[in-house]
Amino acid sequence: MEDISEDYEGLLMKYNVELHTDVDPITYIGNGSQIETLISNLVSNAIKYNKEDGHVYVHIYSKKDNMIIEVKDTGIGIPLADQGRIFERFYRVDKGRSRIKGGTGLGLAIVKHIVSYNKGTVKLHSQLGEGTCITITLPNKS
């Protein structure tokens, strides 16, 4: 998680967003680089689509035989009509804003693919103007 924080130092400064991490000491038996990609994509979006002086919270912990990854932001939120489509390849909620923020439109599709491949689940909670919380549950392979 420290590596991801360092990776986004410039982006955090550019958007004037603060990153808070709470990572429990857990052992995940699975593909670590996939998990790093998943977290990185979620954190990147949470920073880019946040409000100025916003916050991103990352909490990683274990519950029963699962690893839980929760990324929550104080950003712009996602309209209800778009929430069912944000994990589709190339889908963008606001195409004009997305051009300004950059990216390929693949980040959340990659997240969904990694989660599905690892037989996990994704839960989205978002309110327009209040932010978004994405919770990933991944079974700990043994």
Give the ranges of each region predicted by the language model:
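Short conserved segments within the C-terminal catalytic ATPase subdomain
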Residues: 11-20, 25
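Conserved micro-motifs of the catalytic ATP-binding
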Residues: 23, 27-33
